[in-house]
């Protein structure tokens, strides 16, 4: 079935190509015929260009007096032949006389008048030129186009008569019957006079573009009545839209299915379950992201604000930060023993006084983190995030304190010396007491009892 449809489509496309090719050939042949007829007419009418320009000016009323005289002469001649009681012999003789006069004018008088100005016409281009009138080449082109169109119509009509004699007979009888009925209601003289008026007024209407002006004035009314081509097309478009809306919905196309693959649908129950997960639990999305080696910051949280959902309960980063608060220096000079002699000092002790404490604290935190990782197995995502957040926060604070202490080291040199003098005795006593204590066995304690008592006395 599909193969048959494909063959039909190929046959239709081939037929369309053959028709388009035949049309191109016909158009090319027609252009050649028009060019040949135009050249022939141009060779014959090139010497009559002033006369043709004058006739055009009279027909379009560029010369009103001559135009009025022409219309009067033609109307008089028409009604003379229409209302005369003369016989047909007189009319034929009068017509032959006019033909002989025209022949004498063309062959005898006109060549003598035109030979004197032959050199002038050759030197000039085309002589008289009017901006809104047609020149001889343009007249020849339109006349040739009309001649070729009529010739092709008659040739096609004869071909139609040869191939379909019955249809041609029916068509000819219908047309002649229409003319007979029209002639029965309207006299032939009136029809002939209307035809004469049409031939006289048609150039004037084209010259002033009467048809375009009438259409511009009638276009709004035609659009309101929806009889124009634009309104017809819009009405067809609206009908097509209504028809498409009335049709039942069909299955999605392949392109829509491909687009749906990039936009997966979410289940309402799964979304509600994800939203109801507590802080201690983790969704499948969090576990999958953790397995990929990245940190999941779901529900719009960050490691530093993950515990912001419950303000009454402190999170682990807050507890770890509060646990290290006693290590912070106090701004009270009495509590820290710093004499605030300089206003620029803020009472921050130098980290050089406690280098072992900072390294020891970092080492202990690292050991605690390693212990949690080793004992607790694979920790949860929340614990890892909280531990890393606390570790990074404390490291940043210690680095900030170290930088501040280095800047204020020169200003706080004298207060530190005084503080060392005040606490030197207490620190020495504390170190001495710490050195006096040793871990002894019970036997050593019993042996050293008399000496120890003597030393105490």
UniProtKB/Swiss-Prot annotation:
One Pfam family from the record: RHD_RETREG1-3
In this entry, which stretches build a coiled coil?
none
What InterPro entries does this protein's entry cite?
Answer: RETR3_RHD, RETREG1/3
How does this protein lie in the membrane? Answer: Multi-pass membrane protein
List this protein's GO terms for biological process: endoplasmic reticulum tubular network organization; reticulophagy
What is the residue range of the motif LIR motif?
435-440
Q: Where is the composition biased (Polar residues)?
A: 291-305, 443-457
Stretches of Acidic residues bias are at 428-441
- Per the UniProt record, which residue ranges are transmembrane? 80-100, 165-185, 186-206
Provide the residue span(s) of the region labelled Disordered: 1-24, 291-351, 410-457
Localization, per the record, is: Endoplasmic reticulum membrane
Keyword Ribosomal protein part of the UniProt annotation = no
**Got a GO cellular component term for this one?**
endoplasmic reticulum membrane
User: What CDD domains does the record tag this protein with?
Assistant: RETR3_RHD
Q: Which UniProt keywords apply?
A: Autophagy, Endoplasmic reticulum, Membrane, Phosphoprotein, Transmembrane, Transmembrane helix
Predominant place of localization: endoplasmic reticulum
Biased composition, class Basic and acidic residues, residue ranges: 310-326
Similarity remark = Belongs to the RETREG family.
The protein's job, in short, is: Endoplasmic reticulum (ER)-anchored autophagy regulator which exists in an inactive state under basal conditions but is activated following cellular stress. When activated, induces ER fragmentation and mediates ER delivery into lysosomes through sequestration into autophagosomes via interaction with ATG8 family proteins. Promotes ER membrane curvature and ER tubulation required for subsequent ER fragmentation and engulfment into autophagosomes.
Q: How does it assemble?
A: Interacts with ATG8 family modifier proteins.
What is stated about domains?
A: The LIR motif interacts with ATG8 family proteins.
| Protein name listed in UniProt | Reticulophagy regulator 3
Task: Output the lineage of the source organism.
Answer: Eukaryota, Metazoa, Chordata, Craniata, Vertebrata
